[in-house]
Amino acid sequence: MRPVYLDVTRLLKGIFFRKRATGVDRVSLAYVRHYGEDARAVLAARGHHFAVSHQASRRLFDVIKHYYEDDGRVERFLLANALLSSARSRIERGGVLIHTSHSGAEFDRYFRSLKLNGVDVVFMVHDLIPLTHASYCRAGTAQVHERRLRSALSMSSGIIANSRATLDDMAGYAASNGFRVPPAVVAKLAPGTEIGNDATAPIAGPYFVMVGTIEPRKNHLLILDVWRQMVERLGASAPKLVVIGREGWKCSNVIDLLKNNALWQGTVAWYPDCPDTALGGWLKHARALLFPS
């Protein structure tokens, strides 16, 4: 089997800044679980990168899994110690780098240097939203994401897409911009968290759950408007809505609504820092998981 390398830069940043796992992070974590026993870790900054030894990689992978699977309870000095004790090296010629996070690919010297040194890059594309729906993203995100796609299309040896729609979007972008799509596969995503075994629901009565960072494209505003109308008609007997997700970008109006307890009469609850153990319980007993975007 060819040597496998995993870029875990984004996951390590999440630990340093004590962040909960996003959807992209959960995908990267799944690859760490699958390949971690034999793979080596790669870290990158502004296109410069290095690999660490197998032993150091296992320590890093263990810290990563412990942090994201144990509700964020890990001391950062353990991560720092694993990094500082790591001998840095280049990725071996003939190796395969699996890049699952988008982050860092905007610096084209990263993938270019790997290609020149006989390393195959397999790049995972999660979406093209910054290009197809730029108004829902921060200023400058479209330009960064376009650089990532151009790097992947011109210098990677393979593409993983999380859906047929994503792959079709990428193929359309490639055709419009003079690129050839490398060999590609659709790898659909499994659930990112275990459903709890608790037989008791977290709250009494029927409830619905919405999970995701609070930002315009997730359409929380639409759901809250629907719930407001139900509360106006049904009062406190309206079904409950549980919103799980941290505060994101350009969402002050949604946050103001979520904090307006008088408006909701106890029917809407917001959990900005929900651990996975609790999330599993919420999902198990919910009537439905809502995705209005």
Model-derived segments and spans:
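Carbohydrate transferase catalytic cores enriched for Leloir-type hexosyltransferases
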Residues: 1-293
